[in-house]
Regions:
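Left-handed beta-helix
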Residues: 56, 61-62, 67, 75-76, ...
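Extended, positively charged loop/linker patches that create polyanion-binding surfaces
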Residues: 118-120
Length: 152
């Protein structure tokens, strides 16, 4: 039986201090989300400013949600579509020329439902080069998708 009052996020789990986390969430909710669709370089700049590794000519829409950008790598010419969620509790790597379409959910984190305190955990996700994840694809923690794969 779970006792959720004992839940806590392990020290260092987020990969950054609380101030940086809160600052990113404020920037994402304003400067990132309110930017016009065509301002891809602006959003790439914001992500790089928070530690993301972003390749050249990346297309990332303003409605994309990224939990911790310092755990994100996007290869050259990668696209991330409207309303996609990159839940970066663990590392997410998206290869060059890969497409993560609208409303996809890449989820690196979960909970151990068997632990008394519902312990949180994370595993990386790797999307290879020239992949296409079509609309509404869910990718679970620890999944690696090979180069050239189409899912949807």
């Amino acid at each position: 039986m779970q006792e959720l009052s004992g839940f806590s996020v392990p020290k260092g789990f987020r990969g950054a201090g609380g101030i940086k986390v809160q600052l990113w969430w404020a920037v994402q909710a304003t400067l990132f989300a309110w930017s016009p669709q065509i301002m891809y370089r602006w959003r790439a700049f914001l992500l790089r400013s928070f530690g993301a590794k972003i390749g050249k000519n990346v297309v990332i829409r303003p409605s994309v949600k990224i939990t911790y950008p310092w755990k994100l790598t996007l290869g050259d010419n990668a696209w991330v579509g409207d309303d996609a969620v990159l839940y970066t509790l663990g590392e997410i790597s998206i290869g060059a020329n890969a497409v993560v379409s609208q409303k996809c959910y890449l989820c690196t984190g979960s909970h151990d439902y068997m632990s008394q305190h519902f312990d949180i955990n994370a595993q990386p996700i790797t999307i290879g080069e020239k992949c296409w994840l079509a609309t509404d694809v869910f990718v679970a923690p620890g999944v690696s998708i090979g180069n050239g794969t189409v899912i949807g």
